[in-house]
């Protein structure tokens, strides 16, 4: 029986959808290929770093900035949406001179790495129509033109505005919990589930702490790599970040 043109196109669409489903399943089920951290970071680009508390998300972002500075001579902006002057000065004294702490997006430089720590504070899904969110959308849209690498740090994507999620070129996980995959956005649940299983399969807390799972959204596939903390990372630096988070929670900032 000869297919009519309409039926033929319908079958093509079914095959196309099946092919896309196979590509999706292959990416989820395949073993992540091993790469170096620097090789998988896009420049310019937008990277989202997610995972449980105290798993090294901020330390990872600082290592990426260190790599980009040593290889490309890029300065870095450490953007903290809510930080008092006392903590800002303390932080600035510890980090390298080529990294500047700011609370204002107007101070983001061209051709730089921008670390947006606890991005959910001002890129929250519930605030998607606010002036802050609209301004952030505009900055993401021109990140390529301004030659910026923007690193968003958050526990999981459900906290973030959808426009931020769709702008990313890479997603990097540091060990998530089962709750993270359970309460993720529907679009991200399978990916976070894979991340949970990936880290569960790594023996030893030290090995888990070093490991990263990376989703390449441009080529749609998973990679794995290890990271280490940059030379300036100390317990004091970690405590400052924790104090800022506690301070913001007491002020009623949504995290």
Give the ranges of each region predicted by the language model.
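Short, surface-exposed beta-edge/turn micro-motifs
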Residues: 73, 111, 209-211
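N-terminal secretory signal sequences
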Residues: 4, 21, 35-36, 58, ...
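N-terminal pre-Walker A segment at the start of P-loop NTPase domains
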Residues: 3-38
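Conserved P-loop NTPase motor cores
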Residues: 47-66, 82, 96, 100-189
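Post-Walker A helix-loop "phosphate-sensing" segment adjacent to the P-loop in P-loop NTPases
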Residues: 67-77
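P-loop NTPase motor core of the ASCE superfamily
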Residues: 38, 42-54, 60, 140, ...
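A broad, low-specificity signal for short, low-complexity segments enriched in glycine/proline
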Residues: 7-11, 36-41, 111-114, 131-136
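Short, aromatic/basic amphipathic alpha-helical patches
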Residues: 86-98
């Amino acid at each position: 029986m000869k297919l009519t043109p309409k039926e033929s196109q319908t079958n093509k669409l079914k095959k196309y959808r099946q092919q896309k489903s196979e590509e999706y399943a292959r990416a989820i089920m395949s073993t992540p290929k091993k790469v170096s951290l620097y090789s998988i970071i896009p420049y310019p680009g937008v990277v989202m770093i997610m995972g449980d508390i105290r798993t090294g998300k901020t330390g990872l972002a600082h290592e990426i900035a260190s790599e980009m500075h040593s290889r490309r001579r890029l300065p870095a902006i450490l953007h903290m949406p809510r930080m008092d002057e006392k903590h800002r000065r303390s932080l600035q004294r510890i980090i390298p001179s080529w990294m500047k702490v700011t609370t204002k997006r107007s101070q983001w430089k061209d051709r730089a790495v921008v670390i947006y720590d606890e991005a959910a504070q001002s890129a929250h899904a519930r605030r998607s129509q606010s002036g802050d969110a609209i301004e952030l959308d505009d900055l993401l849209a021109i990140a390529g033109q301004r030659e910026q690498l923007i690193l968003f740090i958050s526990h999981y994507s459900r906290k973030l505005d959808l426009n931020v999620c769709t702008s990313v070129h890479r997603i990097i996980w540091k060990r998530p919990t089962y709750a993270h995959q359970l309460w993720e956005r529907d679009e991200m649940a399978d990916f976070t589930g894979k991340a949970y299983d990936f880290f569960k399969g790594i023996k030893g807390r030290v090995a888990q702490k070093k490991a990263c799972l990376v989703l390449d959204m441009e080529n749609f596939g998973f990679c794995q790599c290890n990271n280490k903390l940059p030379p300036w990372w100390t317990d004091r630096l970690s405590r400052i970040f924790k104090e800022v988070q506690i301070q913001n929670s007491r002020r009623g900032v949504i995290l």
